[in-house]
């Protein structure tokens, strides 16, 4: 049976843990609100850009349907961008990403895969399994600004345009709301694969020239997609962390209540024993006086 001192120490420890996990839960909630607002405000813009691109590409001539960011090519190397966290305490967030990644790899020839890992968990998994990691981005999601998204987008575009990879997929968590996040596998490059049968043989006069419109538009669409994915991933991670910390806080409170009950019970028993000793001593003294 634990001593009174041991129980007091345990109660103090659990009390400290309760304060810590509650603080982490509160911090995650603050971060979620900020990221959620940015993510949900960006989504309509991202969707509208995609609608514009789809409409524009349908109207392009053969010359511009061969744009390197639009045209499908023979696939020799497949790029895979994987978003995980750098920190723990986020429940099954990383586990679900890694499980999805394993299934994706199982459907591909691993020797033809090139990986871009965001977060230390993806990097550790890929390194331990000797996969080809092209670039590692550690603590990258600490900055979810558009300028940081552009840096990642340029790295990926450089490899695609220089034929280091022939297509690009991303595995990440799509942030739907604070209670729902889903793992997605999405093809990012080529941007819009359209077969020759699907195109419209129509010609338009573009002012300024079509190349001046198309190049920056395609670049903006890809950079915006990367930014959206970064925001969704960061918001989803915090949502998982908040839920994990909430469960940890609830469990810590249950343990605290249980230990406090044991402590009070032990103290009560100790006081009872002391009272019995005192009573017995008084009775003994009375007997001696007689």
Curated annotation (Swiss-Prot):
Pfam families: ATP-synt. InterPro entries: ATP_synth_F1_ATPase_gsu (IPR035968), ATP_synth_F1_gsu (IPR000131). SUPFAM superfamilies: ATP synthase (F1-ATPase), gamma subunit. GO terms for biological process: proton motive force-driven plasma membrane ATP synthesis. Keywords: ATP synthesis, Cell inner membrane, Cell membrane, CF(1), Hydrogen ion transport, Ion transport, Membrane, Transport. It is a peripheral membrane protein. Gene3D superfamilies: 3.40.1380.10, ATP synthase, gamma subunit, helix hairpin domain (1.10.287.80). It is found in: Cell inner membrane. It comes from the Bacteria. Its main location: membrane. GO terms for molecular function: ATP binding; proton-transporting ATP synthase activity, rotational mechanism. GO terms for cellular component: plasma membrane; proton-transporting ATP synthase complex. Signal peptide: none annotated. F-type ATPases have 2 components, CF(1) - the catalytic core - and CF(0) - the membrane proton channel. CF(1) has five subunits: alpha(3), beta(3), gamma(1), delta(1), epsilon(1). CF(0) has three main subunits: a, b and c. NCBIfam families: ATPsyn_F1gamma. Produces ATP from ADP in the presence of a proton gradient across the membrane. The gamma chain is believed to be important in regulating ATPase activity and the flow of protons through the CF(0) complex. Belongs to the ATPase gamma chain family. This is ATP synthase gamma chain. It comes from Dictyoglomus thermophilum (strain ATCC 35947 / DSM 3960 / H-6-12).
């Amino acid at each position: 049976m634990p001593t009174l001192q041991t129980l007091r120490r345990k109660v103090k420890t659990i009390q400290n843990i309760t304060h810590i996990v509650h603080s982490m839960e509160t911090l995650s909630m603050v971060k979620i609100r900020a990221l959620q607002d940015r993510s949900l405000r960006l989504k309509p813009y991202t969707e509208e850009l995609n609608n514009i691109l789809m409409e524009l590409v349908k109207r392009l001539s053969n010359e511009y349907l061969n744009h390197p960011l639009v045209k499908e090519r023979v696939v020799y190397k497949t790029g895979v961008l994987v978003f995980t966290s750098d920190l723990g305490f986020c429940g099954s967030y990383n586990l679900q990403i890694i499980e999805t990644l394993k299934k994706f790899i199982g459907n591909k020839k691993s020797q033809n895969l090139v990986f871009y890992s965001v977060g230390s968990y993806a990097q550790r998994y890929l390194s331990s399994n000797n996969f080809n990691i092209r670039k590692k981005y550690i603590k990258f999601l600490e900055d979810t600004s558009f300028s940081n998204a552009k840096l990642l987008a340029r790295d990926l575009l450089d490899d695609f345009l220089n034929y280091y990879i022939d297509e690009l997929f991303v595995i990440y968590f799509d942030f739907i709301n604070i209670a729902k996040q889903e793992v997605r596998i999405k093809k990012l490059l080529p941007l819009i694969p359209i077969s020759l049968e699907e195109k419209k043989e129509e010609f338009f006069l573009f002012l300024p020239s079509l190349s001046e419109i198309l190049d920056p538009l395609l670049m903006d669409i890809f950079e915006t997609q990367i930014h959206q994915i970064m925001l969704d991933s960061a918001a989803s991670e915090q949502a998982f962390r908040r839920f994990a910390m909430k469960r940890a806080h609830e469990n810590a409170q249950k343990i605290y209540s249980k230990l406090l009950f044991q402590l009070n019970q032990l103290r009560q028993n100790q006081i009872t024993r002391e009272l019995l000793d005192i009573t017995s001593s008084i009775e003994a003294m009375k007997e001696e006086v007689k």
